[in-house]
Amino acid sequence: IWDEPVVVSARDTEEAARVPSPQKRSQPLCSCNDINDKECMYFCHQDVIWDEPVVVSVRDTEEAARVPSPQKRPQPRCSCNDMNDKECMYFCHQDVIWDEPVVVSVRDTEEAARVPSPQKRSQPRCSCNDMNDKECVYFCHLDIIWDEPVVVSVRDTEEATRVPSPQKRSQPLCSCNDINDKECMYFCHQDIIWDEPVVVSVRDTEEAARVPSPQKRSQPLCSCNDINDKECMYFCHQDIIWDEPVVVSVRDTEEAARVPSPQKRSQPLCSCNDINDKECMYFCHQDVIWDEPVVVSVQDTEEAARVPSPQKRSQPLCSCNNMSDKECLNFCNLDIIWENVDTSADPEFLG
């Protein structure tokens, strides 16, 4: 019930003042570092459910409208995808370039608090300079459509959703070929940005692990920075080689260890250089001679999925019978150091 427009958050033009808030939340939008920062407290709690509209910020008076922000930033908080989006521009630049505050938010009337956002976006509204700025990340992504929350990575099981990632990386796990593939982007960046695991994709419940992907790709989904990270290698290549999911690598959980392979071969997949290497022997012969699948390698546990291989080899672990079998080639060569490669041998593979 504001007689005059109030400067508080981002949702503002006179037009927007007639548009409802997307929905009510049972949790705040963000957590303020300083609970005495009324402007932040208002922004974070604005969609929670106010019984009566509350005036919470010094910046909301006509007087304050002429008072600059207490401190200025040398850089914008984020970058808007649409430079004509006044609400976004205000939010991202509010402590940088405004000599006089701009009226940009509408969620401040009792009426507007019940009105949803005008539309959903398929792309983020802006890109945050600091991806750890949760308020900014939320703002930029708040109108994106998630059709259904999906579990996509081994690291997002029901157990994992309560457990933070074991460690933070300074680099992504992998690089997505399509930066618009949200599932891939989440997987590759999951240990960098998120303090708490987020359910965002679908491919990873125990059920989904046995269901083939809806379509096959001719190129990997992404490129792993560490080819010894079996979980990443599986994720990036999962829609290329498998007609039906086969238990062969990191994903040989205790459950899967009891499930036979869908078909048998009359010849081994490859020949091991060291016949005492049980992991290699199992891999090469898994569809030939085992009556029941055997768990033979420490490297197939969820723990091992995060542990790099103990050492690098100068020779392949084994030799593949079929040089076009990418799974076998990757397995046999995964710990080799390629320093000076002779590409004349098989340019298609080595290239």
Swiss-Prot record:
Positions of Sequence repeats: 6-53, 54-101, 102-149, 150-197, 198-245, 246-293, 294-341
Pfam families: Endothelin
Site (Endothelin-receptor binding site): 2, 50, 98, 146, 194, 242, 290, 338
Subcellular localization(s) per the UniProt record: Secreted
UniProt KW keywords: Cardiotoxin, Disulfide bond, G-protein coupled receptor impairing toxin, Repeat, Secreted, Toxin, Vasoactive, Vasoconstrictor
Disulfide bonds: 30-44, 32-40, 78-92, 80-88, 126-140, 128-136, 174-188, 176-184, 222-236, 224-232, 270-284, 272-280, 318-332, 320-328
Chain residues in the propeptide: 6-29, 54-77, 102-125, 150-173, 198-221, 246-269, 294-317, 342-351
GO molecular function per UniProt: endothelin B receptor binding; hormone activity; toxin activity
One annotated GO biological process: regulation of vasoconstriction
Any Gene Ontology CC annotation: extracellular space
PROSITE patterns: ENDOTHELIN
Domain of life: Eukaryota
Family matches, as InterPro entries: Endothelin, Endothelin_toxin_CS, Endothln-like_toxin
Region (7 X 48 AA tandem repeats): 6-341
Tissue specificity: Expressed by the venom gland.
Main function: Vasoconstrictor activity. These toxins cause cardiac arrest probably as a result of coronary vasospasm. The major effects of sarafotoxin-m are a progressive decrease in heart rate (bradycardia) that turns into an arrhythmic phase that is followed by an A-V block.
Family per record: Belongs to the endothelin/sarafotoxin family.
Protein name per UniProt: Long-sarafotoxin
Originating species: Atractaspis microlepidota microlepidota
